[in-house]
Amino acid sequence: MSEILKSPIQSPLLRGFVTSRRCDASEIEDLGSNVTKGLRVAGGRRVLRSHFFSYCLTYPAVNVAATTETGSGDGATEKCVYLCGNSLGLQPKRTQTRVNQYLSTWGTQGVQGHFKPLEESPLPTWLDADDRAAQLIAPIVGASKAEVAVMQTLTANLHLLMSAFYKPDINGKHKIILESKAFPSDHFAVETQLRHHNLDPATSMITLTSPSSPEDNILTTAEILSAITTHAATTALILLPGIQYYTGQLLDIPTITAHARTHSVFLIWDLAHAVGNAPLHLHDWGVDAAAWCSYKYLNGGPGCIGGLFVHERNSAVPPPVGELEVQQKEGEWEREGYANRLAGWWGNDKRTRFAMVNRFRPVPGAAGFQLSNPSILDITSLTASLEVFAEAGGVGALRGKSLRLTAFLEELLVGEGSSIVGVEERALFRVITPSDPGQRGAQLSLMLRGGLLEAVMRELEKRAVIVDERKPDVIRVAPAPLYNSFEDCVRFVVAFGEALAVARKEVAV
């Protein structure tokens, strides 16, 4: 952590602030401003908050600072702190512009919008909209454009990938490995895939629990590799998260991927919490396949369209379905690298897509896994945010600031020199996210003592602080580098300490 917390943070202002629990709004603002300026000099990225709408900029909350310092308690509005990008990202301001441009195309062009762009509009035709989005998402996941497709939603894409690449043999490889505390939708997807193949999850599903961390289930790389080795002979597929949704742990994707390939086990990564958060190099790492959503760090909007990655070695294009009679050589149809998949017309070659011929020739690459024409409204919303990422220099450029933000937040919460959160309140929570910056993204997960969650969340909301809760006892705090600042981190920690103090008295722990 010392390498991340450079000297600009170790300022007299910070040292004076964190050793005193009494502060006012101007002190908080000064601290956040000075730290931010210092980090810019040290090579940090500029806050891009101006590109985003601020959630509840004047949230109607109790003015706690006024109540504490002056006793006025006049109910004045408080600037809202939004540290919830791991659940739903903020809306980029250009989203409204792009959506209005899409509506203008629809309103004035009708069906011709599929093929004819509106004059002076930057939007592509609807036929090419998904292609443009793929071009923008490819560098974010570290892939070629041909290896990514913008389509469907996360769980649907996981099912589509499993339908193509999970080929169980009850007498050989038939098991699926996943973590014991996987996001429920991933768990449901695996269970139903097994049942779809008339397999019993009790005997064909392996769930990983960390022997060294059974409560939090922080799986070490060694534990995962050992499980793969142990079950390789009977395992057909592995599903793992790039970043674990509950703990915020970033797994060692390249090492685990390489080990699975050594044992000829197909591995799918759920990148819901990794995409737009941590640098990814899916092609270079040799990842088999992956899927993600776009409403968290990618800021596409609630329920927005998802995406998937299929490595080029797994997406070869075969002869057209319906012309098998011309293939005389045995096995020529199953060309190396081709995976049969659930198909639809939008995955068909663009040159013949509208010819209405019942011969399926998939688009080369991941786009050949598409089914129906995608929602252009969704793609327009997503593309607006991806443009902001491109202007910011991509995830790699943002990672430096993200590391500093998260380390700063951790230091304020539990650092030896910080007493913003009182001694009694510190005993009421612990950080379950790995302290190693290389094993986490932007999220810190705080495990509260039992029974405190409801009261703490209520008190945070009163103080105009928005974070995410995961029952029974976890608060997830995610400073997103695109729009969050060091001041946001300070304001959260002050409010969190106060919320814990109220909850402690209320629950009597």
UniProtKB/Swiss-Prot annotation:
<keyword id="KW-0378">Hydrolase</keyword>
<dbReference type="GO" id="GO:0030170">
    <property type="term" value="F:pyridoxal phosphate binding"/>
</dbReference>
<dbReference type="InterPro" id="IPR010111">
    <property type="entry name" value="Kynureninase"/>
</dbReference>
<dbReference type="InterPro" id="IPR015424">
    <property type="entry name" value="PyrdxlP-dep_Trfase"/>
</dbReference>
<dbReference type="GO" id="GO:0097053">
    <property type="term" value="P:L-kynurenine catabolic process"/>
</dbReference>
<dbReference type="GO" id="GO:0043420">
    <property type="term" value="P:anthranilate metabolic process"/>
</dbReference>
<feature type="binding site">
    <location>
        <begin position="183"/>
        <end position="186"/>
    </location>
    <ligand>
        <name>pyridoxal 5'-phosphate</name>
    </ligand>
</feature>
<keyword id="KW-0963">Cytoplasm</keyword>
<dbReference type="GO" id="GO:0019805">
    <property type="term" value="P:quinolinate biosynthetic process"/>
</dbReference>
<feature type="binding site">
    <location>
        <position position="154"/>
    </location>
    <ligand>
        <name>pyridoxal 5'-phosphate</name>
    </ligand>
</feature>
<feature type="binding site">
    <location>
        <position position="273"/>
    </location>
    <ligand>
        <name>pyridoxal 5'-phosphate</name>
    </ligand>
</feature>
<feature type="binding site">
    <location>
        <position position="270"/>
    </location>
    <ligand>
        <name>pyridoxal 5'-phosphate</name>
    </ligand>
</feature>
<keyword id="KW-0663">Pyridoxal phosphate</keyword>
<dbReference type="InterPro" id="IPR015421">
    <property type="entry name" value="PyrdxlP-dep_Trfase_major"/>
</dbReference>
<comment type="pathway">
    <text>Amino-acid degradation; L-kynurenine degradation; L-alanine and anthranilate from L-kynurenine: step 1/1.</text>
</comment>
<comment type="function">
    <text>Catalyzes the cleavage of L-kynurenine (L-Kyn) and L-3-hydroxykynurenine (L-3OHKyn) into anthranilic acid (AA) and 3-hydroxyanthranilic acid (3-OHAA), respectively.</text>
</comment>
<comment type="pathway">
    <text>Cofactor biosynthesis; NAD(+) biosynthesis; quinolinate from L-kynurenine: step 2/3.</text>
</comment>
<dbReference type="GO" id="GO:0034354">
    <property type="term" value="P:'de novo' NAD biosynthetic process from L-tryptophan"/>
</dbReference>
<dbReference type="Pfam" id="PF00266">
    <property type="entry name" value="Aminotran_5"/>
</dbReference>
<dbReference type="GO" id="GO:0005737">
    <property type="term" value="C:cytoplasm"/>
</dbReference>
<dbReference type="InterPro" id="IPR000192">
    <property type="entry name" value="Aminotrans_V_dom"/>
</dbReference>
<feature type="modified residue" description="N6-(pyridoxal phosphate)lysine">
    <location>
        <position position="296"/>
    </location>
</feature>
<protein>
    <recommendedName>
        <fullName>Kynureninase 1</fullName>
        <ecNumber>3.7.1.3</ecNumber>
    </recommendedName>
</protein>
<feature type="binding site">
    <location>
        <position position="155"/>
    </location>
    <ligand>
        <name>pyridoxal 5'-phosphate</name>
    </ligand>
</feature>
<dbReference type="Pfam" id="PF22580">
    <property type="entry name" value="KYNU_C"/>
</dbReference>
<dbReference type="GO" id="GO:0030429">
    <property type="term" value="F:kynureninase activity"/>
</dbReference>
<keyword id="KW-0662">Pyridine nucleotide biosynthesis</keyword>
<dbReference type="GO" id="GO:0019441">
    <property type="term" value="P:L-tryptophan catabolic process to kynurenine"/>
</dbReference>
<feature type="binding site">
    <location>
        <position position="373"/>
    </location>
    <ligand>
        <name>pyridoxal 5'-phosphate</name>
    </ligand>
</feature>
<dbReference type="InterPro" id="IPR015422">
    <property type="entry name" value="PyrdxlP-dep_Trfase_small"/>
</dbReference>
<feature type="binding site">
    <location>
        <position position="345"/>
    </location>
    <ligand>
        <name>pyridoxal 5'-phosphate</name>
    </ligand>
</feature>
<feature type="binding site">
    <location>
        <position position="295"/>
    </location>
    <ligand>
        <name>pyridoxal 5'-phosphate</name>
    </ligand>
</feature>
<comment type="subunit">
    <text>Homodimer.</text>
</comment>
<comment type="similarity">
    <text>Belongs to the kynureninase family.</text>
</comment>
